[in-house]
Amino acid sequence: GVFDEFRIFSPGNKSMVLDVNGARIGVAICEDIWQDGGPVAELAKENIDLLLTMNGSPYEEGKTDTRLDLAVRRAAEVNAPMIYLNQVGGQDDLVFDGGSFVVDTNGTLLERSPMFMEDLSFFDLDTSVEHQKVGMIAAKPDPDEEVYTACVLGLKDYMAKNHFKGVCLGLSGGIDSALVAAMAADAGFVPCAEAGIRMTLRYPCPLDWW
């Protein structure tokens, strides 16, 4: 399955705390924060200044809110702000939606990157103050737009990483083939590389539907 990390990684026997210019940074990897009583519980005993978690968390509809709620719980558990970093892009049948963010100890959302695109953000976190300044918070897409953009990104990266030069579509005139054509166009295929073939059987819609 997607989360069968034992195929690639050997588990460590203790949690990691890094010292960066005097700041104690606890490090967690993806599934670590989803397990109650796991590595985060150990980090809660380490008096850390920041919890950093690196994720390859694939897109699911509604998962953005689930991640945020989980991060708020973990930040409160370790009594420190939390930075949630997430991969972005398509990998075979998976789409990673990005949307990295920062939450404060009290659950305030301090920074959020856009979804479905690479982004380089800088955020100043002062662990010596009680209330942090809020940075740039990217708006969440409309639910329908979110699903559509995930499909387009998955198609775009799959085609690019397999070195496909174009697409050939069977266009019946129905909504489904029209939507696929729109996705191909939004994925960046120029008109000369996107060929549409109108089906000549008895099922296609009349030409005046176009």
Language model features with spans:
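Enzyme catalytic cores with a strong preference for nitrogen-chemistry domains
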Residues: 1-170, 176-195, 200, 205
